[in-house]
From Swiss-Prot:
Intervals of motif Antp-type hexapeptide: 155-160
Encoding gene, per UniProt annotation: HOXA3
Compositionally biased intervals (Low complexity): 126-135, 300-309
Organism expressing this protein natively: Bos taurus
The UniProt record lists the keyword DNA-binding: yes
Protein name: Homeobox protein Hox-A3
Region (Disordered): 73-147, 159-196, 247-310, 399-442
């Protein structure tokens, strides 16, 4: 191939003295070239070396030849193009490339310039050979450039379409109308805006209707739509939203009502201190004792002590059965400690099961209407303040009943103090002394 190309070049450029038949004689020919064209010589100087290095790549001649012509036509081209394709062993063509370079210094080479068109055909023939080596990088370099815009153009429309589809799907699912998902988004947007534009009159009518019926039948819905100048769909959706809101409100209220319902059930118990007393007495194991005992206590003392019924107005209604009266006798003995209760004190012994609980629970027994803390504060306030006898009674009971300070509260029930104090003044020591051992035995 090289020889054929060389002979062709000699035939083409045979009229010129600088050409030689031997492809290796170009070294001598290149010497005049640098004087004529330094750029061409530079560009072609590197090529002959490459040509010597790789004579096998004859197929690359045509492209190199084309590059040389392009370099000659545009001076700026040679430095840029040769490095691109000059790196691979494309240089063997310089023998041919050299002849076209000289035409510039002499005028006659211009006619041969068209003749090089003949070698270009081989270039078209030879590129397949070069295709194995050179065109691949060029094509690879060009292919991404060509493919990237096309791929990008293909991707963007797909991405847009997918996003639109997703938007449509989401909007369709949100409105609950998947059937019209594709065309619905604009309609849905308008419908949503219309929903937010309900007038106060429309809202009032809708609220009234919802108050009577949470679910509308279709005839009523049509009627409402005609009355309110709304569509059935708007009314239906409004009722759906309103029902959801109602459910949320009911849940919140349910939590409050459940806690509130417990509180009222608890509230009646606290007003009657008996509930608190019951809890305390359950610990003392004197459940029957409860608040009921104080009211009977208040009743008999009225007869025995002549106390005014006004002192225990509240406990009286809460009083229940007479059995507390038996306990009352014990309570009276513990609380009043009067000589009249000496026999009742024996009754207290009879209430053996009651004795200790009374001592422990006496604070509760002190006042059905009064909580234990009140009874705790009560004894010193009433008993100690009114008479030393009551104080001594408290001391006697405290010593007599080591079971608990509860009996110390015993004088506390002396809220009917004045009478208690007067009565206790008559036989304070005897009654308490007699009661004390009995209580201790209990």
């Amino acid at each position: 191939m090289q020889k054929a190309t060389y002979y062709d070049s000699s035939a083409i450029y045979g009229g010129y003295p600088y050409q030689a038949a031997n492809g290796f004689g170009y070294n001598a020919n290149q010497q005049p070239y640098p004087a004529s064209t330094a750029l061409g010589a530079d560009g072609e100087y590197h090529r002959p070396a490459c040509s010597l290095q790789s004579p096998a790549n004859a197929g690359s001649h045509p492209k190199a030849h084309e590059l040389s012509e392009a370099c000659l036509r545009t001076l700026s081209g040679p430095p840029s193009q040769p490095p691109v394709l000059g790196e691979p062993p494309l240089a063997p063509p310089p023998p041919q490339a050299a002849p076209p370079a000289p035409p510039q210094p002499p005028a006659p080479p211009q006619p041969p310039a068209p003749t090089p068109a003949a070698p270009p055909p081989p270039s078209s023939v030879s590129p397949p050979q070069n295709g194995s080596s050179n065109p691949t990088p060029a094509s690879a370099a060009k292919s991404p450039l060509l493919n990237s815009p096309t791929v990008a153009k293909q991707i963007f429309p797909w991405m847009k379409e997918s996003r639109q589809n997703t938007k449509q799907k989401t909007s369709g699912s949100s409105s609950g109308e998947s059937c019209a998902g594709d065309k619905s988004p604009p309609g849905q947007a308008s419908s949503k805006r219309a929903r937010t534009a309900y007038t106060s009159a429309q809202l009032v009518e809708l609220e009234k209707e919802f108050h009577f019926n949470r679910y509308l039948c279709r005839p009523r819905r049509v009627e409402m739509a005609n009355l309110l100048n709304l569509t059935e769909r708007q009314i239906k959706i409004w009722f759906q939203n309103r029902r959801m809101k109602y459910k949320k409100d009911q849940k919140g209220k349910g939590m409050l009502t459940s806690s509130g319902g417990q509180s009222p059930s608890r509230s009646p118990v606290p007003p009657g201190p008996g509930s608190y007393l019951n809890s305390m007495h359950s610990l003392v194991n004197s459940v029957p004792y409860e608040p009921q005992s104080p009211p009977p206590f208040s009743k008999p003392p009225q007869g025995a002590y002549g106390l005014p019924p006004a002192s225990y107005p509240a406990p009286l209604p809460s009083c229940a059965p007479p059995p507390p009266q038996k306990r009352y006798t014990a309570a009276g003995a513990g609380a009043g400690g009067t000589p009249d209760y000496d026999p009742h004190a024996h009754g207290l012994q009879g209430n053996g099961s009651y004795g200790t609980p009374h001592l422990q629970g006496s604070p509760v027994f002190v006042g059905g209407s009064y909580v234990e803390p009140m009874s705790n504060s009560g004894p010193p306030l009433f008993g100690l303040t009114h008479l030393p006898h009551t104080a001594s009674a408290a001391m006697d009971y405290g010593g007599a009943g080591p079971l608990g300070s509860g009996h110390h509260h015993g004088p506390g029930p002396g809220e009917p103090h004045p009478t208690y104090t007067d009565l206790t003044a008559h036989h304070p020591s005897q009654g308490r002394i007699q009661e004390a051992p009995k209580l201790t035995h209990l």
